[in-house]
Structure formats: C-alpha cells, structure tokens
C-alpha cells in the first residue's frame, strides 16, 4: 500500500480518533502550513505546495480537477502536475472557499507563515525503526481510541444542494472553529502518542484507518474483514464499558462511538433530528431577548452529534446546507451560520412547534436527547432536501474496499485506489461558471467618501469618531430604504393582488405591517436631518442634538416590536396554507432583494439596539475637550436609548408571553370536564414546559423522552397528550390541571401521606415533599398530587434525566414561593391553643366573638361559654363563664350592652356585664336573662337601611322572623317586655328550609335550599312595607337553571359595589339588581366543596374541611390555599376571619386570619 497516498486521503476524508501507540517514536509535530481558507463554499480544493528544490520526473501523478456536485455543490481540486516525488513529500491541504479574498483557516491553529512540510515517508521510516525496539501491549493499543462510525469518503462532489442554495452563503468568520479537536478533513496535526509525546508517525493513522475500514465495509464477502470489525468492536466495548450505577447518556454514546443518530447523508433526516434535538432557550443580542433561540456553537455541536463526528468544519458545511434551505436563520438576518456563542439563530416558524414538542423538555431530557416515541406523534414533514455526498454509501451493492468500484462517483474510490496501489487520476474539470457572483454592497467608509486632504490632518481617534457618525448615517439610509421596500413592494402588492384571499387580506396587512408607516414617517425625517448635517461639512461636528429632537417620537418601535410575534405567526400560517403567498415570498427572496418578508420586518426589531451601539461608539471616540458639548448631549441620548430599550424589552416580553399562551390555548382540547385555565388573562405566562413519560424511561429506548407534555403556567400545572387525528395533532388534557396552591410533588414513585404532613404543619401551603423511605431515585420518578378537592388524584410520571427532573422541581418551588410572596400580607394569629378538645371532654367549639375593641374573646362550646381577656395577661387560658350545655351561637349588641345566645334551640338575651363577674356569671344569667324565642334553628344580626335587625329561622313550617331592635326590647325587668318584643316583630314564610341570611344595603337575602329570597326593608318601620320576592331568574341563564336541579347546602350573598356576589357550593358569580347574572364578569368554580363563605374585599374565601380557598373576587384567580385538618369558620368580619382546625393531638386550635 502506498502509505503516502493513504495518508493524504486520511488527512482529508477521515477523522483519526485516538492516540498513537507507545511503540511509535516520538518526534516533534509540525503543523501543515498550507492551509488556506477563502470564503466561497462552492470552491474547495486540495493542492500541494511544491517544494522549491523538487523537479518534475516522468512518473508524475497528475491529479485532474473534477466536479460532480449537483447545482452549487462544493468541489475538491487537487493541484495538477504533482510529481511522484512531490507525492512522497507531505502534501499540504488547501481549502478554498472564495467568499473573501483574505485567507483564513478553518481551525484556530496557528499556521506558520512559511510553508513547512512534513515528510510522511521519513516519519514512517522512523516509526518502523523504533517499533522494533518498543512493543506495546494490546491494552495500550486500545487506550483512548475512539472508533469512528461516520466515514469521510473521498467524493467528487462535496455537497448536493437543493435549489437556490447558493444564494445563502456566509461570512468567512463563520468558518472559524476552536483549535481542538482537530478536523481530519481540514488542517490537522498529527496525533500524539499514548505517553503524551508528539510524533509524526503514521502508525496511529493506519490503526484508525483499519478501524474505519472494518466499520465502513460495504460487502460481507470477506470473512477477514468481518473478523477485524469484531475484534475492534470488542476492544472498543471493553475499553468504554461502564457500571450500571453510572449510565451513559445518549450524548456520550454518540460522541464516544461516533454513531450517527440518523443516516448522515440525507439532509431531510438531519433536519428532522436537528429540530428534535437542538436546545431552545432565551438569548440576548443587541439589547433584545430572543426566545426559542440557540447559538451558532450549539447548532454545530448538535449537527456533529447527529452525524456522529468530531469534525466541526463538516458540521459547518451541513449547517450551511440547512440554513440555505431556511431551516433556521440568524435572528437579525445579517449573515449565515457561524460557529460562535455570540451569534444567535432561531428556527423557521413552521419548525418551532415541532422543536417545542420534541425538546421542550430540555429540562427533562438531556441537552441532545430526543424522543423516538414522540416522533410518531409529531409531523415528520420537512421542506429540507438534498444529499451530503461525502457521507453517503455507494449505490453499488457489490462495492467493497478490496476492489475498485466501477462507479466513478463512488465515495470509497480514493481508498480503493490506495488499497490497490493505483495512481490517482481522472475526474472532471472544475466549472468556473458555477462560482458565486461576488457582487456585494461594500460599505463605503467615511475616509473613502471624503478627500484625503480632509482626514489626513485628523487624529486616529477623530477619524474613528467620524467613521462611527458616518456609519450611523449610512445604516439609517439603508433602514429607511428597507421601509420603502416594505411599503412599495410588499404592502402594495399584497393589497392590490389576489395573493392573499380577500376575506383575510385587510386583516393580514394590518397586523403584519402594523406601525410600519409611523416608523417610516419618523425615520425619514430623522434621515433628512442626518443627511443635512453631513452635507454642511465633510467633518460632522455632532449628531446628539438631532437624536434628542427625534427620540421622543421613537415610541412606534414599542408597538411594532410588540406586534412581531403575532405578525410572524400570520406570515408562517399563510406560507403553510397559501401556496401563492409561499411562492411570492420565495420569489422575493431569490430576487435582487435577497430577503423575504420576515427578514425585512426584523430590521425594525433590531434598529433601536443598533442606535445604542452606534451612540456608544461615538461616545467612546469623542474627545472630552473638543467634543465637550456634543458629548454631554450624547450621554443624555444614551440614557434615553437605555430607557427605550427597557420599555421595548418589557413590551416585547409581554407580547411574546401572550402569544405563547394564545398558541397553547388553541391546541388544548378537554376530553371530559372543561376547566378554566385563565388563559384569557393578559398577564398569564408559561414558566416551564417539557416532556415526561408514563413508563419507566430506563426500560424503554435510550432516546425516549416522554409522551406527556407538561406546561407549568404561573397559576397551574397542565398535562397534555398528543394524538394524531386526520393528519392533525390534537392535544387532549391528560389529567385535570392542578392549581399551584394545591400541587404537591415528590421525587419518588410513591407520595408520602399528605394528610399527616398537613396535620403536623397547620396553616401550611402545598409544595415539594421529600420521599418517606426512598433515598435515591434511579428511575427519575416524580409524583404529582392534586390535594383536597372532589377531583383529587395522584399520578406518577418519569423523567429521562435527573437534571431535568431537578429543574422541574425548582421551577415549581419558585412559582409557589412567588404566590406566597404576593399574599404575604395575609397573616395568621393563634387566639386559643390546646385547650378545647372535642373527643376527650366533648368540648367542641361552636362559635366565637370578639368584643370590647378586641380585648375580650367569647367562645361558645358544647359545655358552656368561655371568656378570654387579652387585656389582663398574655397566654392565659380561657375562663369557664357560663355552665350551659350546647351553646350554638353568640352575639353582642354593644350599643345596647346586651348579649344574645342560642342555647338548646332557645334564643336568650342577657346583660353584657355578666362577663365581668366570672364567679357569679351563672347566677346573674339566671336572674337577668330572658327567653326571646323558642325552636330557633339559627339567627343573625346586622344593619340594613339604617336599622339594627335580628333575623331568626325556625325549625317548623320554614318560618322566618325579623326583629327590629330598639332599647325597649331589652328592658327585661319591664312588665311590657313581651308587648315591646312583639311590636318589632315581622313574620314571614318561605317554601324551603332557610340556610343563611345576608344583609345588603337596603335588602336582606334569605338563602334557602331550593331558592333565594330577597326581602326589601323600608325606611319607615311598617310591617306592610316589607316585600319578599325571588332573587334569581331561573329561565335567564342555563347556569342558574342547572343549579336548581339540586338543593343548596349553603348559600351566601355579599354586597360588592353596585352588584351582589352570590356564592354556592359549586360556583360563584355576580348578580345585578334585577337578579340576573352579569355575563361580563364570568362565573368561577370552586376547587373544593365549600361549607362556609366569607368576604374580605378584594378576596372571597371558601372554607372547606381540609383547606381554605382564597380567590380574587374580580377575576376568580386562586391566589392562596391554607391547608389544615377539620377546618371550620367561626366568625367573619370585614378584614378578619376566626376559624378553628384540629391539631395532631385532637385539640381545636382557634386562629385569626388577617387580610
């Protein structure tokens, strides 16, 4: 085998994985000096730097130019007239890309200015000599060897692009890559030996070649070839084997074995896998945040992973092919793909949805993991076509490395010629006419626009200042020209033709080109002012005053940038459903304009950021003395631009959030009960999203990510399941959405007992629980629990990676903490500790009351009345005041100094001063109290229309009595007591059992089991003036009609401004004065089954047995849930609620909830 020819092919078409054996001699390594990179991807050539002392002989191996690419495929040119002597010398690789006249290396290696050459023959002879004395063991030979899977074949044509691929070529800078790992296809150092020393020997190259030959075989005819493949495979597996406790991720497997994720020659497959694998996140460029974007380095990393190669330049070539077919683009449409963390790119809008589906769980999956199962549920249609020839297999079924293939375009041809010791030759000549047109609008600098005599006398700093000012002028001129193109080319043509259907044409133009005319009006005048200043003198004194004049009129940029997400959505929607529009956009892109609609519209997004950068440049090169006045104004301009950019960030961020929520709203389908997610709220945001699996991921395919897509909103957690129906993907709700205040999660397969946690931590909130017994989580399981509702459930899901699982947990913690911080003004205060026990002494708390300006607390229990005086001492125990059995309710009329108690279905009235004498309280109560009413089920006192009224409900005949309070009633020792009591009494009858009384401004609502009655209270106390009617109109609304199918358990009414807020066990809503539901304010459903209600504006509170539900009364948002065990509300005030709960020992703790 001709080792020189073989080494030439190795260096260009193969990557050499691993290091040389210890048997190889260690000689200093010299870099190939002939690497030349120019910037046109259509012309790639391999040439040999001729040695000055070399002479031509008769046996020269002429390497003809050849081109076999389709359309604008890249070409490899081997320099002609290469003698055999020159071939024996180390050939130097030249890569010519003709995008720029200045040479530039693909890698970051330092190239010697002199063309140093390495004689591979000499180094090989040295290795052979040294290998006789030093022999390495098999383990040493295998150490650190990475066997490649992707073959770097020699091919007449590097790329076979689809149409129009040649019009999207990049900047030369985009081809620069880090110096390591070295790419064998381009400038490459010889690999170091195992002992860390450098060597120029080709032994490691031959070893890697043998690995490539075994893995890239095309025929199974050779048993020797198969045995080599098995030998190297076994060695590789032994070397890279790992324990089960340390699983290898998909990324590690691909990069170690060089295993491509798809067939790397088909660009369509690479495009689909790229969409599924690329990690989308938020990046910032020129002061603006770009969501769902990625860096150039991430793109090349992902492409190298997909094709299973460490050659970043190879990834660059594939990236250019994909970018040329509009798979992704620079966010500013300024240049092509570059291998840099500073350059930001985004997928085409039609690809974003698929990318979200497959890798929106980047927090769940590894950075480059993809879901094989989700591919079945995702659309695999792609508009990317083409074949990457160097990575293709030969189409001949009989092709092998042992004989020369009959096909001249066989990718294995060069290696076959090397194996058979054939001379290089043949091929097609390069077609110069296929070279790209280099017509580029070169930017004219300020020094070229003015005579040399003008700037010769200026300092270097002043020249740079004038250059910055002139750049501001030229870029503004270009921007205004783009606006004119938008107005005259796009808007006018779309309005005057039938490209867009007539029914949506006006709306499309209105939203896509929103605020373009306002921006054009302002910037045209701004440009005129700049042009006038430039024309006054070749040396511009300054432009700060012009900026200060026009900056207040730059507000249309805010509205324009905020409208971009929706405009982009409309454009991509029309492209997908309207072939006429897609054709029009493609024609514009391929015309002299060279950009599509979206590219032109994006210039308005980046323009404010460019202003900030240019002004900063001008300030940097301004002289503090000579440019003092202009510099001071420029500092003001910079502050104003910073403020503008902050406002733009807020506006664009809010618009993007709103757009994301709208897209989510459109694709949600509720299979069973509809749940209001609050997506119509303008402040709703998607905080996190990803994929989880219903199955153990470790038992499935290594690339499996999940089949359940979750969305963490700022108010709840949503689970969706994708299903294909008639080529459309429906996203049905997998489980009922869980509000964050009721969401418990645990990183394990089993949830610890939540009830025990709530009982031991009273007044707690939902959150993350630690596993009870499990110390590790090898399956990456996570349990979600919906707590305390009629729809409560638990579901266990699995995450592909522990890092993603931890990210989800942290995001949930952040959102739940944010909700608590927003309601930190809601506080708790313990009024009575462990004193009342309902099981041991049957001393159940029935009612409480605060009187004497909050100094006295009265507690009514089954064993009597207790009093707690906070003014005398702290932490004292309640005093048993009255020894009466079963005191149900208590109320105090402080203006009359009377206490009213409901004891064993009898309503008593007694003087309030009995609470001051605890020792004689029983005697005073028997002596001075009077029975007001008998057979009383409940009572309530309050004010209505300026009168103090007591409402009494009886057990028999659904009777209701109204007592108008006056001082004569409570003269218990008077002989006219009963007469005075009867004088203020009004009797009513309702058709069902009364449940509650609600005092409104001049009405009293009586909530009954079957309906709601409203009682008008006249200003003048006339028994005939009290009128009762039914409040709700059954036939007015379907919601109300459905409510009457069942009897009510509890009903409460609260006056809110000019409306009435009605609360029922299922839902709540606003009523107007006519008793009709206010449709504009919505209808809110409770999470639980409330037993009591309270109102503390702007909050409405529903009391359940195991949690307190606090909602915003205007929009129904669930702001907080207070968890507990056996919760009961005792009394409610305007800004306070007294309630009790049961602690782990069974004591009833009385708490005060302050708003």
UniProtKB/Swiss-Prot annotation:
<dbReference type="InterPro" id="IPR035899">
    <property type="entry name" value="DBL_dom_sf"/>
</dbReference>
<dbReference type="InterPro" id="IPR036388">
    <property type="entry name" value="WH-like_DNA-bd_sf"/>
</dbReference>
<dbReference type="Pfam" id="PF00621">
    <property type="entry name" value="RhoGEF"/>
</dbReference>
<keyword id="KW-0344">Guanine-nucleotide releasing factor</keyword>
<feature type="compositionally biased region" description="Polar residues">
    <location>
        <begin position="100"/>
        <end position="143"/>
    </location>
</feature>
<dbReference type="Pfam" id="PF00610">
    <property type="entry name" value="DEP"/>
</dbReference>
<feature type="modified residue" description="Phosphoserine">
    <location>
        <position position="155"/>
    </location>
</feature>
<dbReference type="InterPro" id="IPR036390">
    <property type="entry name" value="WH_DNA-bd_sf"/>
</dbReference>
<feature type="compositionally biased region" description="Low complexity">
    <location>
        <begin position="155"/>
        <end position="167"/>
    </location>
</feature>
<dbReference type="GO" id="GO:0005085">
    <property type="term" value="F:guanyl-nucleotide exchange factor activity"/>
</dbReference>
<feature type="compositionally biased region" description="Low complexity">
    <location>
        <begin position="190"/>
        <end position="227"/>
    </location>
</feature>
<feature type="modified residue" description="N-acetylmethionine">
    <location>
        <position position="1"/>
    </location>
</feature>
<dbReference type="InterPro" id="IPR001180">
    <property type="entry name" value="CNH_dom"/>
</dbReference>
<feature type="domain" description="CNH">
    <location>
        <begin position="842"/>
        <end position="1137"/>
    </location>
</feature>
<comment type="function">
    <text>Stimulates the exchange of RHO1 GDP-bound form into GTP-bound form.</text>
</comment>
<dbReference type="InterPro" id="IPR052233">
    <property type="entry name" value="Rho-type_GEFs"/>
</dbReference>
<dbReference type="InterPro" id="IPR000219">
    <property type="entry name" value="DH_dom"/>
</dbReference>
<keyword id="KW-0007">Acetylation</keyword>
<feature type="modified residue" description="Phosphoserine">
    <location>
        <position position="433"/>
    </location>
</feature>
<dbReference type="GO" id="GO:0032153">
    <property type="term" value="C:cell division site"/>
</dbReference>
<keyword id="KW-0597">Phosphoprotein</keyword>
<dbReference type="GO" id="GO:0005737">
    <property type="term" value="C:cytoplasm"/>
</dbReference>
<dbReference type="GO" id="GO:0071944">
    <property type="term" value="C:cell periphery"/>
</dbReference>
<dbReference type="Pfam" id="PF15405">
    <property type="entry name" value="PH_5"/>
</dbReference>
<dbReference type="InterPro" id="IPR000591">
    <property type="entry name" value="DEP_dom"/>
</dbReference>
<feature type="region of interest" description="Disordered">
    <location>
        <begin position="100"/>
        <end position="249"/>
    </location>
</feature>
<feature type="compositionally biased region" description="Basic residues">
    <location>
        <begin position="228"/>
        <end position="243"/>
    </location>
</feature>
<dbReference type="Pfam" id="PF00780">
    <property type="entry name" value="CNH"/>
</dbReference>
<dbReference type="InterPro" id="IPR011993">
    <property type="entry name" value="PH-like_dom_sf"/>
</dbReference>
<protein>
    <recommendedName>
        <fullName>RHO1 GDP-GTP exchange protein 1</fullName>
    </recommendedName>
</protein>
<dbReference type="GO" id="GO:0007264">
    <property type="term" value="P:small GTPase-mediated signal transduction"/>
</dbReference>
<dbReference type="InterPro" id="IPR041675">
    <property type="entry name" value="PH_5"/>
</dbReference>
<feature type="domain" description="DH">
    <location>
        <begin position="464"/>
        <end position="651"/>
    </location>
</feature>
<dbReference type="GO" id="GO:1903338">
    <property type="term" value="P:regulation of cell wall organization or biogenesis"/>
</dbReference>
<feature type="modified residue" description="Phosphoserine">
    <location>
        <position position="154"/>
    </location>
</feature>
<feature type="modified residue" description="Phosphothreonine">
    <location>
        <position position="180"/>
    </location>
</feature>
